[in-house]
Amino acid sequence: MSEIKKSRFQPVAVVGRGCILPGCRTVDDLWQIIAEGRVETSSASQDDWHVNQARLLSDRAGVYELDKMWSNHGGYVRGFADHFDASQFQLEEKLIEQLDPVFLWSLEAARQALAESRSAGVLERTGVVLGNLSYPTRAHSRFAEEDWLQQM
């Protein structure tokens, strides 16, 4: 009989899920997208980039050009603000208005996970695992716009 190696990590139970992703606002939406085989990526809109895309996009695919990119295609979360209910959080409205959308998405996903877990009263043993690629947030992009785009 093999000896079970002791782990220094405590066991984890995933008891709730939540997500905000391109094209979906809930885990059920995500499963529907998967079941239908849909792809929810799209081209950037003016609201996504706040800059004339023609200045940045190259029509020479695969050829490196300084300050140019080959695609504006990506996974953009759209319409979230139309459905976000700030009153469900015990935070000051002014603070919520100042937060970058990536933080609001995280708050909403955590709210969904807690609701699904049905253990909202047992928070002392509750943790959150967040995933986010290291792309700039909208707030970071606005900061860059205020400084760099004025120089262009």
Report residues per predicted region.
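Cys-dependent condensing catalytic cores that perform Claisen condensation/acyl-transfer
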Residues: 2-152
